[in-house]
Amino acid sequence: RTEGAHAGYRIADRTFELPEVKLLVDLVQSSKFITTKKSRQLIGKLEQLVSKNDAKKLQRQVVVADRNKTSNEKIYYSVDVIHSAIAENRQTRFHNFDGNVRKEMQLRKNGRFYQVSPWLLTWDDENYYLVAYDADAGKMKHYRVDKMLDLSAVDQARRGQTDYEQMDIASYSRKNFGMFAGEETTVQLLCDTSMTGVIIDRFGASVAMRPYDETHILARAQVAVSPQFFGWLAGLSTHIRVISPDSVVNEY
């Protein structure tokens, strides 16, 4: 409570400081997973966590671009359904889609439903993924949440608990470039020394590396051999080259 001519009440302390809220706003702005409409709604709610003056400062800095934002408004419903299914130990089913050349949604598997046992939601490379057990394939798989339609929980108990408990999600994410599956293989990469940071960022600080000569290093890592891995290599082809095993060299 304040005294004097302008007596009244003021908030002595706030849970969030302006830099903290600004960080959250930046994350919402840059997230491809969150639609433009939802981004503006969330930022409006975040502005309520700071004073009116600080909120005005945020508003002057906020620009929500449509570029690379998803258009699937059902994502938030999907996340809620998945969380509930995990908590209730239930399976889920959904349609999965890709975009065609006309930028239209095209259902995968000829429109058949996917039915899986959900175990984890994870964030990777600016996208949200469901990690789930596919009983037909007998293994864990991953699915982009923004590519799901018609998602619902199924009154069947989840399967694959042993597979999930044996799973190292951090290692799994590192090996599955772009979160597309492929055969797991240990590869050896010949890299410019300037690529040391790139290798650590991609494979983690525990990646095996050693000097090769004055300008190169050798790195060994387990990866999921897939078009996404080869695409990553192609983007760095003048600096990083796969040299073994021969099967991967020949496939690339």
Language-model-detected regions and their locations in the chain:
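Bulky hydrophobic/aromatic content
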Residues: I11-K103
